[in-house]
Amino acid sequence: MKFLLIRTLVVMLSLSFLPLLANPLTNNPIYEIGQEFNKQLLCMAKNIYYEAGMESYEGKLAVAQVVNNRVNSHLFPKTVCEVVYQKDQFSWVGNVNGEIKNKYMWEESLMVARKALTETHIHDLISKTKALYFHATSVNPDWNLKKITQIGNHIFYAKK
């Protein structure tokens, strides 16, 4: 009788762990945080790649910091992906097929994106000035904004 009771308890305990064994990642907050981080990382890296891929390392950092500044502003959405894919904000969105043609530029964009998502201020000037906008030097938009600086082929702006 004692043997039967012990065996029953062992079976019951074993069965209670089956859902975890079937899918160990279900409802795992650490896994979910990792998945969300990877999603935001890819959005940031794509934006850096398509907006500043040919720019210097500093130029890439500045573009990433603008995205971070927007995430921290009440004027814009609250996640990197929402900021990047917000309608009419970045010229590449909707105009590229997503193909990564330059592996080196992509790797550097990923590295800058990771830095942007894990460090507080990656580009001091853009961060301190709260720059929220930039454009290529090849265009001349009629913006009523305060010009902060030019880095490479981009001019950065903040609200007045």
Task: Please state what every model-predicted region is.
Residues 2-11:
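Sec-dependent signal peptide recognition
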Residues 17-19:
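N-terminal signal peptide c-region/cleavage motif recognized by signal peptidases
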Residues 23-160:
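Bacterial extracytoplasmic/cell-wall-associated proteins, especially those involved in peptidoglycan
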